[in-house]
């Protein structure tokens, strides 16, 4: 999958200038960087929510995309009904609810869930379908460590089993190490480093990434 170069400008200021990248099927890419580095803008452009300055989709027109934003949404119906909006496979829905510890919330109104419960439901809903590319923007930010690890296991399995390319925006270096094959580091709207997660996070090549890793490892 070829991700073409693109840029994004707000009020005359370039907030993202991306050089392009070839993405591997079945691989998980973590996107890291400080607040304001361009991570979420990058995710929204790939999801088709924001337009690039070039007014073209950097992925082309025939790539199916699944997107889980930072702020999750729920319809005023049960948790199970919300999940089934992603696909009508009842067995798949039940399996995902079991694995994400949502079964006891089966009949609860989804708009009354806690933040962590809502995130798990949104993840289950997305995983009801297969996509060429899946973008998860801070999917576990509202979860505790136990459910974070459950979600990470499912995310990794989903990429492996479906063969989709998965992009995970995260603030957690530990999460990037645990589940991603490659990591992309953004700073001030630029991709500063990209490569194997183990290599990149353990032996940064640039001073910018070295300082970032040291700060977020405290």
Would you name each region that the model predicts?
Residues 198-218:
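C-terminal boundary and immediately downstream tail of ABC-type ATPase nucleotide-binding domains
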Residues 170-171:
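H-loop/switch region of ABC-family ATPase nucleotide-binding domains
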Residues 72-87:
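Conserved catalytic motifs of ABC-family nucleotide-binding domains
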Residues 134-137:
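Catalytic Walker B motif of ABC-type/P-loop ATPase nucleotide-binding domains
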Residues 109-113, 117:
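Conserved ABC ATPase signature
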Residues 90-105:
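Conserved ABC ATPase "signature" region
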